[in-house]
Amino acid sequence: ELIEAVRLIKFLYQSNPPPKPEGTRQARRNRRRRWRERQRQIHSISERILSTYLGRSAEPVPLQLPPLERLTLDCNEDCGTSGTQGVGSPQILVESPTVLESGTKE
């Protein structure tokens, strides 16, 4: 069943090739706009097909988190830098009561 669903989704995506880069700027823009709209429709149809075949909802299961007053961010390495450094492994520390309790600076 899953292989059939994947084949069907693959066929849907193959039936909508990217637009040709010819014609006036306006014509190319319109073709890209229509192509993106068809891609969105194919994406939503694909989600419905997968949820039907797999028997589960497309909605993500909500993540269970501890109460907000017990959450802190671990900022050991390069917190002030921009870019993508340190993005790979965010850490959440639990049970640090003094960090979020008072809103005043010491």
Swiss-Prot record:
Residues 8-16 are annotated as: Homomultimerization. Residues 14-39, 82-106 are annotated as: Disordered. A motif (Nuclear export signal and binding to XPO1) lies at residues 63-74. GO terms for biological process: mRNA transport. This is Protein Rev. It comes from Human immunodeficiency virus type 1 group M subtype B (isolate BH8) (HIV-1). Belongs to the HIV-1 REV protein family. Residues 26-37 have a biased composition (Basic residues). The modification Phosphoserine is found at residues 82, 89. The RNA-binding motif binds to the RRE, a 240 bp stem-and-loop structure present in incompletely spliced viral pre-mRNAs. This region also contains the NLS which mediates nuclear localization via KPNB1 binding and, when the N-terminal sequence is present, nucleolar targeting. These overlapping functions prevent Rev bound to RRE from undesirable return to the nucleus. When Rev binds the RRE, the NLS becomes masked while the NES remains accessible. The leucine-rich NES mediates binding to human XPO1. Asymmetrically arginine dimethylated at one site by host PRMT6. Methylation impairs the RNA-binding activity and export of viral RNA from the nucleus to the cytoplasm. It comes from the Viruses. Transmembrane segments: none annotated. It is found in: Host nucleus, Host nucleolus; Host cytoplasm. Homomultimer; when bound to the RRE. Multimeric assembly is essential for activity and may involve XPO1. Binds to human KPNB1, XPO1, TNPO1, RANBP5 and IPO7. Interacts with the viral Integrase. Interacts with human KHDRBS1. Interacts with human NAP1; this interaction decreases Rev multimerization and stimulates its activity. Interacts with human DEAD-box helicases DDX3 and DDX24; these interactions may serve for viral RNA export to the cytoplasm and packaging, respectively. HIV-1 lineages are divided in three main groups, M (for Major), O (for Outlier), and N (for New, or Non-M, Non-O). The vast majority of strains found worldwide belong to the group M. Group O seems to be endemic to and largely confined to Cameroon and neighboring countries in West Central Africa, where these viruses represent a small minority of HIV-1 strains. The group N is represented by a limited number of isolates from Cameroonian persons. The group M is further subdivided in 9 clades or subtypes (A to D, F to H, J and K). A motif (Nuclear localization signal and RNA-binding (RRE)) lies at residues 24-40. The keyword Iron-sulfur does not apply. The lineage of its organism: Viruses, Riboviria, Pararnavirae, Artverviricota, Revtraviricetes. GO terms for cellular component: host cell cytoplasm; host cell nucleolus.
